[in-house]
Amino acid sequence: MRGAGGAAFGDGVSAVRFCAVSAGEGRDDDDDGMARRLTLLVTSWDGTARRYACRAREIGDVKSLNSIDLGAPALCGTFVGTDEDAACVGCLDGSVRFVDFKTGAFRVVGAHDDGAVSAVEYDDATKKLFTFGWDRTIRAWDLTKDERGRAVSTTKTAGKCYAADLRDGKIFVATSDGQVLAYETRDLVRGVDGDDGRRASEAPPRPLINRRSSMRFQTRAIAANIRGDGFVAASVEGRVAVEFIRDEENDKRKYAFKCHRKTDDASVGEIVYPVHAVAFHPVHGTFATGGGDGYVNFWDGDAKKRLFQSPRYPTSISALAFSPCGSLLAIASSYAHEERENNKPEDRVFLRETRAEEVTPKSAKTS
């Protein structure tokens, strides 16, 4: 394990994200992606968006490329497609900012009306940026248009958007009222009026999913699986749910399990930690969870088995991200105030080189 550049953060780390890689881009001779140069985006409550460069075969050689002060706590971020110089960040003040790492400048794309931006996702299919806010809206932005403050579409949700993920043209959203929603991205921007930025049709887009979460407590993180037929959601109650889009399949196959808990003999019994992060391995389809207990667990969702538990990190795991080939896992170790603050460790980002036994499904190991 290595810290990303050894850099200290002035406040908690909110998100980590690798830049996507175009087909054939940066591949080495044996085509395993291990020598490929990777770019990592890190956002922080200290108001910075930072960029790092690394390689799996040279995991100790992590280079800090640049850091941009946004002037507001940054809660989430994503690269714009495969452009490692362009990123978008959502902030606590509701603003959505486009960051140009090449020039070191940023501009405000727009803003949500009330409250923070909890997630930002760029969709290659529609070439739109989707943002999710505490103002109970999902907004789509056209980054090619210099129309500040004007979203090309706005979709209302019943609850605040607390967590979201996008994969292969599907958006998954967990809201404050305990609902889970899913949409096709093309449906969210279909029929928009490009002149005034409002939806041309009054009929709201029809969701793929609009159902009650199977977990009793607040959803903290959500991630779409790599097959595109379901998702994993994690809650503040140390529990993870595996669910599917189609109602018939979901009724048969959905399940939930407890994790990130420990028994404390000196107290009343079990201590339950929130699960702050979920990330799917891009090749094998297994997934990792990060909790307030400081551990990263690797899971085979189909076999319903834990594959591996990492050594304990200095403090809570606030964010996770696999590299495009799955050779690296970025791990944000950042205190999330689950317990009384006492000698709080330094907020850091670690890079872990994944091993086959940690991420390979059990069915593949035995075949």
PLM regions: where:
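WD40-repeat beta-propeller superdomains and closely related acidic/aromatic-rich repeat-like regions
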Residues: 1-367
